């Protein structure tokens, strides 16, 4: 596991460096092809890490009989539909709660057992950092989901969170107990969200760090399954999500490709994040990481 984590870490840092070098100043709003490419990568490389929930469920809930499968699938689908229902009924409140849950979920990238505040700062800055230099772009993105007034308020509030959060993170990274690789990863993530267009930064982060790291850890946590079962769990649910997304877009009244794609991807990620987090919590995945003592995973 340590070798794979080192490789993933080094690759992410390298990709981030190239992205910062060649992607700084790129306006995705004026480059639809690049925007489309970023969204495609987000779906193809980001969504699969949630597809492993099936294997987590088999290992956790001992799904040997049809009734157990139906109970799990029913609970998972109901949770996803409940998220969508809340979004339709109380969009603004739901969006704020989703951002908070996302920050908490992203904080698990860093397996720093003794630095919970640092982890939370890391997760929060992933959400808030773009507000410093890309406030207009972030407002436009949020306005695709919620009203423009709330979007503006959220972005302005994010600025106030970013400054103290960034200072705390900087001070904590001076700590000698934190490995140099973790410091480089954190710096790379923060640089992406500070200097690149929010969609480009999130696509690189979500695919290269969050999803990739989860896949590697999951591979070792789910050791009872064969490689074929692992690949099947990655491929088939991902295909189903893509088909559902295409169907949703075809049924949409407003077929503005850019807006609808971003909206569908967001709602899809939101709907799947809640049951995904629930499955991970039930599986004691984080507890396993702690007991294995992968402090920095390498």
Sequence positions of predicted segments:
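N-terminal membrane topogenic signal
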Residues: 1-15, 67-69
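Membrane-interface helix-loop-helix junctions at boundaries between adjacent transmembrane segments
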Residues: 59-74, 78-132, 139-149
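Hydrophobic, membrane-inserted alpha-helices
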Residues: 16-21, 74-84, 100-106, 166-168, ...
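Transmembrane helix interruption/hinge and helix-loop junction motifs
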Residues: 27-33, 85-94, 193-202
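Alpha-helical transmembrane segments of multi-pass integral membrane proteins
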Residues: 118-138, 155-172, 185-201, 239-240, ...
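C-terminal ends of transmembrane helices
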Residues: 50-60, 100-115, 167-178, 214-222, ...
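Hydrophobic core segments of alpha-helical transmembrane domains in multi-pass membrane proteins
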Residues: 35-44, 91-104, 201-213, 265-269
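Short, hydrophobic transmembrane alpha-helix segments
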Residues: 21-33, 252-256
